[in-house]
Amino acid sequence: MRICIISEGCYPYVVGGVSGWVHSMIKTFPNQEFILLSIIANRELSGKFAYKLPENVTEVHELYLQDDDWGSVNKLHKSKLKQKEYHALRSLLLDQDVEWTVLFDYFCNNNVSINELLMGEDFYHAVLDAYNLQYPDIVFSDFLWTMRSMYLPLFLALATDIPKADVYHAVSTGYAGIIGSMGKHFHKGQFIVSEHGIYTREREEELIKAEWVQRTYKNIWIRQFKKMSKVAYNTADAVTGLYEHACELQEVLGCPKEKLMITPNGIDYKKFENLPAGSPENKQYINVGAVIRVTPIKDVKTLIQAFAYAKKRCPKLKLWIMGPYDEEPEYAAECFKMAEQLEISDIEFTGRVNVTDYLGWMDMTILTSISEGQPLTILESFAAYVPVIATDVGNCRGLLYGEDDDFGKAGILTHIMNIE
């Protein structure tokens, strides 16, 4: 069987929960052939893998959403759309019922010049219709260029050559969901969507926090992600969520209930038995571990501020931030600077480590994320008999406080961005 894994912004370029899950799944089925279709920001990331690919990965295909060469790709071929193609494009821009298969066929069969399409008459008139009907109070030139920048990555996805496979497995909706839908349409393979976080909600949270995006354009972007998710849900043969509430959100966002199933995360708990104890020096502290990537979605700045607040009240505390800090170097630099400015001692940024070397002597672990699914770091902490402090996001409440059981609490839950 030939299985195409479609991922956006994670495996095999970035270490993290979803990437680790994909890597483990591929290794679990050594007799199956896997191909990767990896969606990344730009060509600078090409081939820079954070994982050694298993032997049963036979191909890697890359899609660049910020492709500097988009204007020269497939140059100067057909730009005038047929009536049904224009209707599908206009419906897409107006957030109406979109004939996605018409768009799939148009981009696949016509050697489309994305430059010609975005700068051409048909796209201009469709944008003008959307503007007149829905957004007449904003500056048209700004609206036009926003729509071009918004639809560039989608059109790049639609113009991608889809490798043939028996199964297409997207680990999110969004652009990965579009690719999976196209794979099913063109090659008649089965299509599975497995969401670890709810993609649309995560993008919405990022947009709400973004200061550089005007409110009107935030709403336009949010609707864009919602309709992309909806086509994936409608096309997929099965859609999995990590826990019950996640599936409820997927249904609200348009997934037919009969397609939904809960597939919770799991870990090899035996790896966390008889973990090494810490050194006598480390045992002098109350050790707090954070197994996280240093990225905005993990809200490391709140973690640092919370530690500073607690350190003043309990000088024996020591914080270990265990995870890579090269994914978003500017944000990581801001975190390092914040720790220096707050004059906090006893914070260690370890980089990527084997967590089993550390968990055995942690007194607790902490997670300050603004968005999560069902965090593996919490499951690993529990396997190591370590309690957890976590924000009330994703399935953290169910993990810490239980769901229909009487085991009691396994930690403390708090709201996001709470330094106290």
Language-model regions, residue ranges each:
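Short acidic alpha-helix that forms the nucleotide-activated donor recognition element
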Residues: K230-N234, G351-M362, A383
